[in-house]
């Protein structure tokens, strides 16, 4: 399913070419203005698949404590919403030296509804949770964030702002690799939020600190676009 979704996204940018021929199959460097790497159609499909599969599964892995995943998802959606509005506005995109994409500002509306729905979900998902997201919700939300980032040419920015998702996924990869190669575990338990729990940190404290980390990197992501 994730690869099919990746193929659909790739086909869309291949035929629609919202950024024109010269930018369709490129990766944009968010740290440097006017810095991008052309990788071609085939490599772009592989890259899109990695982003889609990585994002959806990373968000899914993070969904292990009450309220842990939905707030970072909303924060990332907020940042992408700001970027989509700026990118779809000729004046602001020129001011920040971002590539203008016609009509992409409509994604701001979609992301806003996503944030609103997330707040409603958080009302009942905060500790002690009454409802749970499940794989259907977490995989979908991760895929949505990846799709929006791909349309905005901000895949690397997604990795920065969604640093909590990256850390959670890496903790699982490191744990599995270490156990298979060395016969030893790096963490008491993976994903890493369970490691902190086993170290004696209350669930609510783990959740709150992950929220704070996401907020810090969200601010960093916005500053990167302005100060680069």
Where are these regions (language model features)?
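Membrane-interface loop-to-helix entry segments
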Residues: 1-4, 66
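PP2C/PPM family metal-dependent serine/threonine protein phosphatase catalytic domain
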Residues: 29-38
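Alpha-helical transmembrane segments
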Residues: 7-30, 43, 47-48, 52-58, ...
């Amino acid at each position: 399913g994730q690869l099919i979704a990746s193929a659909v996204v790739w086909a869309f940018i291949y035929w629609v070419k919202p950024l024109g021929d010269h930018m369709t199959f490129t990766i944009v460097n968010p740290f440097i203005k006017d810095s991008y790497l052309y990788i071609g159609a085939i490599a772009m499909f592989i890259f899109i698949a990695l982003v889609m599969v990585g994002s959806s599964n990373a968000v899914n892995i993070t969904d292990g404590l009450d309220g842990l995943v939905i707030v970072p998802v909303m924060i990332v959606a907020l940042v992408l919403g700001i970027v989509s509005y700026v990118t779809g506005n000729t004046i602001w995109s020129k001011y920040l030296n971002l590539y203008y994409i016609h009509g992409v500002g409509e994604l701001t509306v979609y992301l806003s509804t996503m944030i609103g729905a997330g707040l409603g979900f958080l009302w009942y998902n905060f500790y002690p949770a009454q409802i749970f997201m499940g794989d259907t919700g977490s995989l979908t939300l991760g895929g949505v964030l990846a799709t929006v980032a791909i349309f905005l040419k901000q895949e690397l920015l997604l990795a920065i702002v969604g640093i909590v998702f990256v850390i959670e996924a890496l903790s699982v990869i490191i744990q599995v690799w270490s156990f298979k190669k060395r016969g030893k575990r790096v963490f008491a338990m993976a994903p890493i939020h369970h490691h902190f729990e086993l170290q004696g940190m209350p669930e609510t404290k783990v959740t709150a600190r992950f929220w704070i980390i996401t907020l810090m990197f969200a601010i960093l992501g916005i500053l990167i676009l302005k100060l680069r």
